[in-house]
Amino acid sequence: IQNMDNFKPCFGKFEKTSKKTLSLIFNDKSEILFDDHKTTFLHERNFNIDQGYKIFEGDTKDIVLFCDDKISNQHDNFIKKAQTFSLLDEEKLKIYARASQLNTWIYKTKYCSRHGTKFENVTDDLGKYCNECGFSHYPKMSPCIMVVVKHKDQILLVQHKNSPQFFTAIAGFVEYGETLYEACLLYTSPSPRDSAL
């Protein structure tokens, strides 16, 4: 995919249509399946996995998310999240970011936090319904900021907190009642609070 302009984000259970399908496949470790040459994670077949979710809709193709723990034994090309970023261009990063987050919500969030009851399958509005309490749960949204501090032709990078070999732009979560501007000031001040990274 060279351009995501022809695709719009959506969500719904995958149903076979006359449209072509591009499949993304995660295993139970949240690793994504690349092709043999490590050039793409979008496959033009679904590997006979039954349940999937349409996450992008295009004019002639849809992009569908699949997760299957059995497929890991059949393929050697599953790649961990940290290793994928050097393999992705901007357009594929958009697809990967959405797919990875949805994969975590759909396949890793299985039980109601109130009762421990197993959820029903995810619905078309991304909700998961608990039969015990009748409450619909939705993915958590965590507003955050990413700040780039520039001076002439230089950019300020900070050492990644959990992976000292990585450097990154300044990033962190926005606290309740805090504006984006206030969060930027706090993370870029001489004694900033701990960055989320």
Q: What label would you give each PLM region?
A:
Residues 1-89:
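N-terminal alpha-helical interaction blocks
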Residues 26, 127-169, 173:
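N-terminal strand-loop-strand
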Residues 79-102, 109:
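A gly/proline- and charged-residue-enriched helix-loop-helix capping module
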Residues 101-146:
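Cys/His-rich short segments
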Residues 170, 184-189:
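Hydrophobic alpha-helical positions that pack around
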Residues 180:
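Phosphate-binding active sites in nucleotide-utilizing proteins
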Residues 187-197:
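Conserved small/polar residues in nucleotide/adenosyl-binding loops
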